[in-house]
Amino acid sequence: MKICVIPGDGIGVEICAEAVRVIDALKDIHGLKIEYEYGLLGGAAYDQTGRPLPVETLRLADEANAILLGAVGGPKWDKLPAESRPERGLLGIRKYLGLNANLRPIKVYPELANASTLRPEVVSGLDMMIVRELTGDIYFGQPRGIRTSGFERVGYNTMEYSESEIALIAEMAFRIARQRSGKVMSVDKMNVLECMQLWRDVVTKVGERFPDVTLDHMLVDNAAMQLVKNPKQFDVLLTGNMFGDILSDEAAMLTGSIGMLPSASLNVEDKGMYEPCHGSAPDIAGQGVANPLGMILSAAMMFRYSLGRPDMADAIESAVQTVLTNGARTRDIFQAGDRLVSTSEMGGLVEAALRRIS
């Protein structure tokens, strides 16, 4: 197996190192044959090559079974032309690899229920999956741009979805729901957007092929409210690209820290890019205080969805649970009575727990 490791920008370098450390432990314990190739993306790629997505990185990603990504972006590159910004590199590699589905599990560990800004009884036991379409919608629709009209500038973007794009992501959501509670909530804005009217129609038709799965629909503004009012009503939440971008970050804070959350971006062949939900956090980069658990749990998702080793995923997740139960916390999830640890210390504790339980 070959993994393309892309540390990226900011804290991505630190947290990627801890994920590799955990994978190395699994290699040592179980004799796994895994090779690493390191690539550049985002601001780091621009600084070294003048491009946010070098051709060499695409080659490495093509040859790998999976891609492990730290984080991309930062204010250092905000004034670059749009086509040179780090985020364009991220969108580009997603499009190149055909990563049409983003999976974001939202899980509240019992030990962290008090870390949420919501009451513990509202979030305790929360375990949901957000399934977000990743290659269509307003982020990729054409035409787009800024033009001059009369005496002022006008910015414009195009929200667009094809039936096939919607059907593809809907099918994935229904398949995942079959392995969980059998419930899908599709989020749209069909009351004002024709694009979302098509979304609801196609999702409904796909749902007819899954009679064992219950499908409901909800407008995005109501969904945003319900996520903080009663999040445990959701199991699989199906969304388009832009709405999913917003709702997944909102849902992330239900857990107490976005640093806890992994994600997977998959294509139809289950090749995936795995990254934590948080950004590059340049304000804390290099200080050793970043939470690596979202990155480590992303590696667990990699074993589950792309490498065909759900047993390795289970082992990593059990090790993380053990470390949290024992009271270790990075700064973002630290509360009185906990044991404060650094980025590398947290990675070391997960590695040690993994070796004990394997």
Swiss-Prot record:
GO biological process: L-leucine biosynthetic process
Record-listed Mg(2+) binding positions: 221, 245, 249
Catalyzed reaction equations: (2R,3S)-3-isopropylmalate + NAD(+) = 4-methyl-2-oxopentanoate + CO2 + NADH
Cell compartments where the protein resides: Cytoplasm
Pfam families tied to this protein: Iso_dh
Domain of life per record: Bacteria
Site (Important for catalysis): 139, 189
Residues that hold substrate according to the record: 94, 104, 132, 221
Cofactor: binding comment: Binds 1 Mg(2+) or Mn(2+) ion per subunit.
An example molecular function term from Gene Ontology annotations: NAD binding
Chief localization: cytoplasm
Keyword tags: Amino-acid biosynthesis, Branched-chain amino acid biosynthesis, Cytoplasm, Leucine biosynthesis, Magnesium, Manganese, Metal-binding, NAD, Oxidoreductase
Similarity annotation: Belongs to the isocitrate and isopropylmalate dehydrogenases family. LeuB type 1 subfamily.
Subunit organization: Homodimer.
Protein name: 3-isopropylmalate dehydrogenase 2
Lineage: Bacteria, Pseudomonadati, Pseudomonadota, Betaproteobacteria, Rhodocyclales
